[in-house]
Amino acid sequence: METVDTSQRLACLRELMKERKVDVYLVPSEDSHQSEYIAPCDGRREFISGFSGSAGCAIVSMTKAALSTDGRYFNQASKQLDNNWLLLKRGIESMPTWQEWTAEQLEGGKVVGVDPSLITASDARSLSETIKKSGGSLLGLQENLVDLVWGKDRPSRPSKKVTVHPVEFAGKSFEEKITDLRKELEKKKSAGFVVSMLDEIAWLFNLRGNDIPYNPVFFAYAIITPSTADLYIDEDKLSADVKKHLGDKVSLKPYTSIFEDAKALGQSAQAEVNGGASDPPRKFFISTKASWSLSLALGGENKVEEVRSPISDAKAIKNDAELEGMRACHIRDGAALTKYFAWLENELLNKKTVLNEVEASDKLEEIRSKQKNFVGLSFDTISSSGPNAAVIHYKAERNNCSIIDPEAVYLCDSGAQYLDGTTDTTRTLHFGEPTEKERKAYTLVLKGMIAIDTAIFPKGTTGFSLDTFARQFLWKEGLDYLHGTGHGVGSYLNVHEGPIGIGTRVQYSEVPISAGNVISDEPGFYEDGNFGIRIENIIMAREVKTTFSFGERPWLGFEHVTMTPLCRKLTDPSLLSDAEKIWINEYHNEVWEKTSGYFEEDELTRNWLKRETQPI
């Protein structure tokens, strides 16, 4: 990870700020759809700061610059930021939030500028209130100043073809999904829903794209009313098959006309009020993640209602076809990972091959690509050896990465997009003799992963409540990890999917776990400069039978679908309970039963799998 000299970029940005009478300028990570993962053309925060992580906000004043990010990226940011930048570590008590730091720069009635398409309406209101206390004000600038600094070197916006996602994998037609959405909107007396999140649009219309790396989505907006369905998309992205799929039930409109139409909808709603209609006017709904600019186009906070997206809620509860697809693709994916780990061990120990982290991950992609229904990777593979494994979201660069050390911990976090599902698996291995500390750390993390997997809890329980199940064994030793325990996973969609998850984020306390949710289970431990441990399975929430049923409500548990062995060499059986040993042995028996058939003619992998799945 190289440090980028940002001095000239900051100087140019400050000149533009001065011209526009802006004292502080905000550069969020997200695009105009509030996507976590973005297209290269939207990488403004990375361009101005040099920090390439997926989360964070850059704040630039006329004399200072700060970058705020969460615990996943503290190590990475400290390496990538040059001396122009102060790192604000989110969640650390001694550190101000980026909003507080911004307010500190504003004495004397200064102005904070931001592109209103890159910040949510609720965040804009909250920030405005914070900076008002320091005498400052928030100004939305329609032209993005970082884009002006970037100039002709900024990548162009992708315009790749959209494809139909077959109903055999989707499990429900797009017409049924729109009908369900309309019923939900009618219950809440809404005039309609303006859809801005890209994965929600892809899911709703049973379409997939390729505009953002690793995420099968496409740039679009949609407006759904009781009688109309409008899709705002560049028409050259649509094939004849896609147009036939949508038929006459969906009106196609230019992507750029969304704000003009939103403004017209807002004015139409106001006209109804002025006309003296007897019933209260129905408001349009937008997601709480919709942009400030979209809210303003519809008339502002008094004219629209910001809600947790009903599409997000529906999408998170997978139907039977999606759940079956998840089971199937994880078996194939687990077989690919097993083949890769067997190959890697053989290359390092028997052939004494010198491999770097990227060469190894390239081999994994090659193996995966041969699996049925493979489309591509679901995120950049984290292939990390030794101290690099302590960088939670490490990215090995092709011309600047480490040789894999057989005598050090190797952490591999990887996933793929298949037509029938999305995978995300982490395994930590050791090809030599691990230290006692490495074995203890691994086993404590494993115990936490098993605790989530085997949890039984009443309906209505949130991921916030479950988080301590995973951390308890580390906490007893005074250890912890600075990331969430689990995130929602899409079905041939984004590998990080809301609104559910397991962790300490406020949002995880708001939405309970429901049957049909697909979530990662991935506790970890990281010792900077030395090693990192993470173990990740994908689990699916389901109703379970219990001896009793207190409160006469359903009880839930999890079904794991990830099928690749855990690391025997790093596991210390003396730290495991009898129940945990039984779980590991049963899990490994399941892995053998479901994946060994892939290796009937592959003796190397079959022998490795048999060895790794023996009872402990």
UniProtKB/Swiss-Prot annotation:
Belongs to the peptidase M24B family. Catalyzes the removal of a penultimate prolyl residue from the N-termini of peptides. One of its GO terms (biological process) is proteolysis. Mn(2+) 2 binds at D413, D424, E536. It is an enzyme of class 3 (hydrolase). Gene3D superfamilies: Creatinase/methionine aminopeptidase superfamily, Creatinase/prolidase N-terminal domain. It comes from the Eukaryota. GO terms for molecular function: metal ion binding; metalloaminopeptidase activity. GO terms for cellular component: cytoplasm. Mn(2+) 1 binds at D424, E522, E536. Its EC number is 3.4.11.9. It holds the Pfam family Peptidase_M24. Binds 2 manganese ions per subunit. It catalyses: Release of any N-terminal amino acid, including proline, that is linked to proline, even from a dipeptide or tripeptide. This is Probable Xaa-Pro aminopeptidase P. Its cofactor is Mn(2+). Keywords: Aminopeptidase, Hydrolase, Manganese, Metal-binding, Metalloprotease, Protease. Transmembrane segments: none annotated.
